[in-house]
């Protein structure tokens, strides 16, 4: 019984630390700025979400209920990320898309924070945190790119 307790304790420690062991290597991005430059460019909320991987509160974001035609760009570098054509009502309180505008413009990496494993979505040009992607979206992809409004800017179609 003592051995079983020891094995369970050891397994618990390994499981708890596994998030750190699985973190991705630091990436180099085309657009790089100092922390001070990011703070100067972004609002405090944008900085917290885009650069420190925060999350805006559900149903508070500017684009959660946006139904205008256009495209969504990265707040950090203006890279085109999503289109209103793939936006859908997910009921989550965040703008949701079933596909990026161009696959290579978003980067998906494992996020092992908060005691769970999720797929984080980042801008492939500047590394800004955009949100997460889940496998519960509509056809044709079955994906739900759940984005933070503060990580995006909207360009209305002409």
Residue ranges and their predicted role:
Residues 1-23:
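Bacterial Sec-dependent N-terminal signal peptides
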Residues 30, 39-45, 49-73, 79-158:
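A short Gly-Trp-Pro
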Residues 23-39:
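Short N-terminal segments immediately surrounding and downstream of signal-peptide cleavage
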């Amino acid at each position: 019984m003592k051995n079983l307790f020891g094995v369970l304790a050891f397994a618990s420690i390994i499981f708890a630390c596994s998030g750190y062991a699985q973190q991705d290597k630091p990436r180099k991005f085309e657009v790089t700025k100092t922390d001070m430059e990011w703070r100067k460019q972004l609002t405090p909320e944008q900085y917290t979400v885009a650069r420190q991987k925060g999350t805006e509160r559900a149903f508070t974001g500017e684009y959660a209920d946006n139904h205008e035609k256009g495209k969504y760009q990265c707040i950090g570098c203006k890279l085109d990320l999503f289109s209103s054509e793939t936006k859908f009502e997910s009921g989550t309180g965040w703008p949701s898309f079933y596909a990026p505008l161009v696959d290579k413009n978003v980067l998906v990496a494992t996020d092992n924070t908060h005691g769970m494993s999720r797929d984080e979505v980042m801008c492939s040009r500047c590394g800004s945190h955009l949100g997460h992607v889940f496998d519960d979206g509509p056809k044709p992809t079955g994906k739900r790119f759940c984005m933070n409004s503060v990580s995006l800017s909207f360009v209305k179609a002409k």
